[in-house]
């Protein structure tokens, strides 16, 4: 049986869109659905699928979360482009099963319409791993769900901030 997890909702024009994860026993894939009313959803298709090449670091786990969503109170909830691309952070891994093996955070992007189901391009290597030199005790096993925000006022001193779950 399939298990659905971690919806991320955003807006494009008159549509609400939702990326979500499906777990089928092998691992996570990232999917897209559309709605006019936030109640009735239509599945559009996959955004990040399993890889045929089992040697790729994220072959069996691709759990994606849209980045740079305009989340201002009363804002438009649309995805924002950076350098002409829409972005998505995701946790990935190459072992089969429920969150099995090392899980790291990667980034994916597209120049196409994010409201249309298509495969997003992924960076070749993860951007955060549990074996990074500066890893701390609470993130030295697995890294999970992440959210990337655009701090245009540089409140934090950086243009982008990632919140993520790890153990």
Regions found by a protein language model. Name each.
Residues 1-6, 10-64, 68-141, 150-167:
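Beta-rich carbohydrate-recognition and catalytic domains
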């Amino acid at each position: 049986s399939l298990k659905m997890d971690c919806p991320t909702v955003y807006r494009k024009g008159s549509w609400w869109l939702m990326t979500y994860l499906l777990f089928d026993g092998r691992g996570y894939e990232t999917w897209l659905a559309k709605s006019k009313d936030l109640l009735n959803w239509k599945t559009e298709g996959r955004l990040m699928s399993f890889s045929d090449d089992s040697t790729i670091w994220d072959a069996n786990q691709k759990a994606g979360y849209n980045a740079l969503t305009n989340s201002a109170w009363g804002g438009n909830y649309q995805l924002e482009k950076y350098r002409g691309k829409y972005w998505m952070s995701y946790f990935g891994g190459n072992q089969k099963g429920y969150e099995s093996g090392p899980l790291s955070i990667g980034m994916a992007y597209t120049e196409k319409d994010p409201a249309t189901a298509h495969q997003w391009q992924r960076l070749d290597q993860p951007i955060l791993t549990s074996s990074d030199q500066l890893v701390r005790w609470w993130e030295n096993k697995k890294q999970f769900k992440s959210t990337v925000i655009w701090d245009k006022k540089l409140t934090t001193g950086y243009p982008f901030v990632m919140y993520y779950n790890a153990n």
